Amino acid sequence: MKELLLALPAGMSTEGEKFGLIRACMAYRVGPGPRLLGARLPAGLRGGVMQLDCAGFDGDGDPVDCCRQILGECRRRGFKGIVCDFEGAPSDCLMKLVTILDRNCAAQGRTLYVPESYAASAPAGRVLISSVLTHGTLERRLLGAAERYGKERTVLAVEWVREDFPLPAGGRGRPLAQEELENLIRRLEPAVFFDKGLCAHYFTYMVGPKAYFVLFDTPRSVREKLDLANRLGIRGALLPGPEIEPHLDEIFRSDL
């Protein structure tokens, strides 16, 4: 693929560079005001892209000064782009912030990445399409996004999922820690299947009369997601570094 971002916390080392992965530095947040908040970073850290979340932000205020802070930090650190890792419903303040960043990034040669809910606010930006779904197929979701935004603007946002759903499933399931998933598999010894439509592994189990569905990712499923996006002509992806860093060799053992 042409553009692979690896989201990593501040200070976490990676071997991603040998696979052509670009670091997305998870050290920044839109805080009250709004203003830019950031973790303490090594003075020499430069390059890659900034990853920005909005956890705890109340949605109030004028974002102009915050945008200046964000763009100034990009200049100081040599960041080539900004990933807006914004969860929840868009607020007017954050939509305005995205619009300002989109205009400035386009003028300054930086790339802006936004969730699909902010796509209309960033006409020059890339649109992040989550890999998570419990019905339909990932192929259909990516094809729909490529039709709406164009293949060049569409970026697959890979999530490392471990979730337990009561059946019938709807929305998101209960997150499982890795140890909890391993204990569940060891205790139940279930038949584990790979769903090509979801590009994920799953198994089912019963607790009394209630049925449950467990969906989870592995290096194989991440690779399948990337292969699918590549076949569809979608050349960008954002990967969850803390989860997949130990598996990079397995995922990228040959060129995608």
For the regions a protein language model found, what residue spans apply to each?
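Chitinase-like catalytic core of GlcNAc-active glycosidases
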Residues: 1-134
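Generic structural signal for well-ordered alpha-helices
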Residues: 67-71, 95-102, 139-146, 226, ...
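A structural motif corresponding to the C-terminal end of an alpha-helix
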Residues: 74-79, 104-110, 145-153, 224-235
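Short catalytic/ligand-binding loop motif for oxyanion handling, primarily in non-cytosolic enzymes
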Residues: 91, 121-122, 163-167, 245-248
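Short acidic, glycine/proline-enriched helix-loop-strand junctions
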Residues: 92-111, 194-206, 246-256
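Alpha-amylase-like alpha-glycosidases and glucanotransferases acting on alpha-linked glucans and related
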Residues: 121-151, 155
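Glycan-binding loop/region signatures in secreted carbohydrate-active enzymes
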Residues: 153-225
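Acidic/aromatic/glycine-rich contiguous surface patches that form carbohydrate-binding/processing clefts
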Residues: 225, 231-256
